[in-house]
């Protein structure tokens, strides 16, 4: 009887995990994409990003998870804290942004795959811009493109966004999907 309880509890826990971890809503609908882009109007141009690139990414939604590759050049100089008015290191504001971003990412079925700091210059690069002295990189797993939209609309994320802007001198991000990986998914390890 005890074995049944243990295995039953384990199966229930795994089932609940999969309900949270996997996308059960399918790809985005055109109306969802239009509503999101209308809400974000004006935000793309302020950072030099393209609404057309975002639209193409959202319209190509296959309902699967993706991993965002983020390269960040952090602001290591002093900047004015928008909350206190005091001078703080920009990198501290970037860390404060991360403290808001991570819970919102988890709530939406995402998690970091890997975050690290840069330890050298470009080793293999051609036909690309010069290294802007990236500081950190992150691989952030998103359950779906819909969840990315929900995260961007999350009030905690939106409130923390000024910290990201002040704590970041440059950033370069693009979505990816796994082709080959020795990273074992939590679907297997949980």
What are the residue ranges of the model-derived segments?
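Short S/T/G/P-rich N-terminal loop/turn motif that feeds into the first structured element of a domain
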Residues: 2-134, 177-190
